[in-house]
């Protein structure tokens, strides 16, 4: 009842998806609905439509829509919960990764850059130790060259050519501390040429012709210049060792003490998850593909077929019993789980008496019958068929409501005892009075069966036997149809009579009805007019074919009323 085929398509809010979610059934069938379709449903509009529908909805339709709304909302909530959980886990992992390694470089690696653009060109005059002197302050350099150091070579041929070079002590640096450059590792040190390569004295020399001559150990020890060079080299090594320790102390001044930094707080949940990820995963069992075994017995013997035919009923009963036991066991297990889940006493002990009051009481059949007998059926609303498009545009049903409401009270008390398929109950109900149909149809004297009608009915009854039934429940359906037609005809009579009185006792058929009516409605009105004319309720006159039809009241029938 109240079923409209367009309610699932014309309404916005995804009513079609809600209907499918309610009627598909199991969770496996719900996988047919895509995530895009479920997320497109507007829950607010759907709830407003179900709660405050613009037109009456069937009970089954409204219940299915409510179930579908809950299922769609549950799916939308599960999608949202999974997204939030995934994002939360990612954020916690990144946070723990950063806190465990505080000095990690988080800059994005640009692999498309050219390494040559990031490297400085090599400069042979660049000395990085210069920037470490006295808190990154360079001393002023004064190169004073003593020309007297460039002496002429002596007559002694044993003197080395290296002795003609100027002394390294002539290159001095004027600073506020009066330090020499050779006293600091970070300065420009022009050492003596005798200690040019290593700290040990050279074991060779150049002669007058430029040839290399090896020197013995005695010559090296006897030469005072070589001994001075060795002493100078030893002094330089000690100074460099001291200066290196001083430089290291200065460098540590700018370093960060790792012991002062706060310890990272590990997130236990994330650590456990990372630990579990590093563990080797357990091997999963491969799904064994089930194959159909070939049937070796291609043919069945006659004896086997006869046994199957004889024991068919017993085998079906046994299979049905097994199926029933299996289902009953599964359903009982599900009921136990539901009872554990919906145990209201576990939430709060004060809810138990309130929930017991809401449970329906188990009444006996006798009590139900007693309750049904005491119901006043005249006040109970019975479902009616929805009026079609033609019924909404019939003018005589609309205009006759005020005239037909006179006898509504008496008709509601008596009612009609015709049964309809809508009254599918154990006890009899009476049809309620419709305001668009008057209850009294006896106002027309010619509606009663005349002598001609009685003769015709007697002749028809002689030709048909008593056991002849053309259709099932024909008498009952014809009685209901005749009652509806008589009420429609009575409504048209009241409508036409009012129009004739307003038009001074006569009116044409074209002016009786509005011009915007459809052709089936006009045909139904003409049928009612001819039916009332045959029963002497109206006087109908037409001068020539296809001309105007004049309608007036029959004064005899009016006086009788």
UniProtKB/Swiss-Prot annotation:
| Region Disordered, residue ranges | 223-247, 401-436
Kindly indicate whether the keyword Cell inner membrane belongs to this entry.
no
Q: Which GO terms describe its biological process?
A: chromatin looping; homologous chromosome orientation in meiotic metaphase I; homologous chromosome pairing at meiosis; meiotic centromeric cohesion protection in anaphase I; meiotic sister chromatid cohesion involved in meiosis I; sister chromatid cohesion; spindle attachment to meiosis I kinetochore
Any single GO molecular-function term of the entry would be: ATP-dependent topological DNA co-entrapment activity
List the GO cellular component terms.
Answer: chromatin; cohesin complex; condensed chromosome, centromeric region; meiotic cohesin complex; meiotic spindle; nucleus; pericentric heterochromatin
Give the chief site where it resides: nucleus
- Low complexity bias located where? 401-412
Instruction: Could you list this entry's UniProt keywords, alphabetically sorted.
Output: Chromosome, Meiosis, Nucleus, Phosphoprotein
Is Phosphoprotein among this UniProt entry's keywords?
yes
Question: Compositional bias (Polar residues) spans?
Answer: 223-241
Processing and modification events after translation? Phosphorylated during prophase until after meiosis I.
Q: Where in the cell is it found?
A: Nucleus; Chromosome
- Spell out the subunit comment: Interacts with moa1.
Q: Which family does it belong to?
A: Belongs to the rad21 family.
- What protein am I looking at? Meiotic recombination protein rec8
Q: From what organism does this protein derive?
A: Schizosaccharomyces pombe (strain 972 / ATCC 24843)
